[in-house]
Amino acid sequence: MVLSNKVNYWTGQAGREFEKEFAAWSGTAHAIALMNGTVALDVALLALGVGQGDEVIVTSRTFLASASSIVNAGAVPVFADVDADSQNITAETIQAVMTPRTRAIICVHLAGWSCDMDPIMQLAEQHDLFVIEDCAQAHGASYKGKPVGSIGHVGAWSFCQDKIMTTGGEGGMVTTNDTALWKKMWSLKDHGKSWDAVYEREHAPGFRWLHESFGTNWRMTEMQAVIGRIQLTRMPQWQTQRLANAQAIWAAAGECSALRVPVVPADTVHAAYKCYVFVKRELLKEGWDRDRILSEIAARGVPSFSGSCSEVYLEKAFDGTDYRPAQPLAVARELGETSLMFLVHPTLTTAEIDKTCAVLQEVMALATA
């Protein structure tokens, strides 16, 4: 690829082929390859016309980009609480914070578990709202037979280094079934070029006038696209292994009385980006809490974490703004104080997963009253 000197979107073919393959894989009509997952959210909001005076509802249990993209669009992030099992926003928590200024919803499918999308889409239709699916942690997840990223108006994907699949450290994608929206996003990511002017219009000899609006350069490189195409072929095997690893940890955790293991609905395929279980604090011995459990697990050589930021609005970036909710979001805070997160990536060996399970049970036996 490098020796060919065809290394950007306009000199090579890999980017365009990756877009076609990813659209087919995600069950959508269109896909656009981008430089990272954050600009996937940016281009979605811009194309939907979200801006000054608008409010966008989003979860607080997420990475900052889900909220900062709203701020950068000139809109106001409004944080909704989450479901205790999926850790995702729901139609009920969304409706609780809706106002006449609400323009859109960003649904983050946290850790590979999809939001309950039917009620959310029904609510959005009733109130003429746009829905962006943040699929950064959910490659391969599905809801009632539909791949995530194919249900809302736009799916925004990340291929960052630690995601389920990567394009060499950074990368992103947007997916949609709306052709007009696809053309608008395609134009925005490439200096305002018009798809019709580039591909579907006859031009007189001489200079070709292609830029019919204003945009910027958010294109993916050909090297990124080549890596993405290869990784996409490995997704079925990787997803099977990820889920098997998560199920082993869930089974071990299920034998610990002081742990709560959420049950994934039968109509949902979990992408198993990470594996979460939750501490029942009322069943712990005195002197034990989630953080001590994490420390004891780590001391025995097993990586374990508290998980995703539970109240992203507590970041310093929100100081001096009106974006923080008047009261802490109760469920999000509870999850943030009780969650245990484990790695389940497909390169982990059976011995490593077995050790994770054994250490988890050993530590919980010490911690449980």
What are these model-derived regions, one by one?
Residues 7-55, 69-73, 79-81, 146:
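Phosphate-binding glycine-rich loop
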Residues 13-20, 28-29, 92, 104-108, ...:
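PLP-dependent aminotransferase class I/II
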Residues 32, 57, 78, 131-132, ...:
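Structural detector of well-ordered beta-strand residues that form the stable sheet scaffold
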Residues 46-135, 142:
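PLP-dependent aminotransferase-like
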Residues 68-70, 123, 147, 164, ...:
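Hydrophobic/aromatic ligand-binding patch that stacks against planar heteroaromatic rings
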Residues 133-168, 183, 207-212:
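Conserved active-site segment immediately N-terminal to the catalytic lysine
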Residues 157-158, 172-177:
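Short beta-strand-to-turn element immediately C-terminal to the catalytic PLP-Schiff-base lysine
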